[in-house]
């Protein structure tokens, strides 16, 4: 945990002299990201052509620049990760690892797929993503960085499971490749190629250079939470708290569905309260502000209601939001880890002695204040200073005993809004029985594994489906999930 223990370098396959070698971007080659492999799964309630899915995916990845995604991961003599890009991709050295399983049965009749999460009429815990590993990746797919380093395999694994009325499409990859924003770009561009709209695929940005290499070398203002940076014995006390907590409590993952009407009512109420409190008739909070405040209140519900314990909320923030006019042009695809963090500091009592609107508005203000170009650059400067001083880019802001919740909202990635209808062989579920159009995902699911770090309290928000429901999931203490499940089940319908 926390990278305190290191193992010797794995033995790599023989090098290919014709490979193009490119170092990973600094933001990609970190201790945390090295330890994580992720899988994204999409359920389509239609029968999709697996051959079309495979060929269009390969066609996208073999475009100029995009070929980098098919690279093999290797360690150089300095212990840093490199991309080894084959001169050409073929059956011996494919651009993507491909697997396909077909079941001659409805998705609703299969013993495992019949348990896939379904939307609920009220906020509810609807499943455990780990229960579906058999459906989301093949047994041969790499599960750790060690697997990638010791085998001559591409970074992406495409696994398709076909039923008589549905199709599950899953992509697994090392987190060193990209974040949720980059993953969404791959997904959307794949759909463009599938639709024969290749000319609309944006050019690949940063093929053999890092556009963020010098970002944060200077900053025009201090970072807003500089005084909260943990150093010295306070940092080590924080680590001890985390190690103890990880040892004492078992971690488990769950999937939560939040119906659209429920969240809309919560947001409407919050905006009314905020405007009445501030006298500002233009004050607002977003769906994300309300959703993260609402779930954080659930997650800290085991503490005494009047506790002054610090609760730190982190929202991932895409750097392209502030760098879209220069370093990360919006007209190009940047497949890398290019997110920063925006923090909000509250206390447990803020969630239980004040209305939910208080926490939601605090999150909104943090997003507005911390999401400027100047503040994003100031935080990046702190990260670079931490790297120079301590050998990693992991500054910790807050206090040693704080409770942390982290969120990454992928709604803007439009996972539920991407059109795969060009691959339909046969429509599955009747149109009147579903909210989404044929060829659009009815479910998006995520899972991640880390060989070194506890991913507890990291909650991706997968987005909003066609019916308006929000989906989020992630690992918490098992006892916390059991309490949340009970509270949601017993909450009166409004």
From Swiss-Prot:
This is Transcriptional regulator calD. One of its GO terms (cellular component) is nucleus. Keywords: Nucleus, Transcription, Transcription regulation. It comes from the Eukaryota. Induction: Expression is induced in complex medium (Czapek yeast autolysate medium) supporting calbistrin production. Calbistrin A has been reported to possess a number of interesting bioactivities including antifungal active against Candida albicans and cytotoxic toward both healthy and leukemic human cells. Transcription co-regulator that might be involved in the regulation of the expression of the gene cluster that mediates the biosynthesis of calbistrins and related compounds such as decumbenones. Calbistrin A is a secondary metabolite with an interesting structure that was recently found to have bioactivity against leukemia cells. It consists of two polyketides linked by an ester bond: a bicyclic decalin containing polyketide and a linear 12 carbon dioic acid structure. It is found in: Nucleus. InterPro entries: CAT-like_dom_sf.
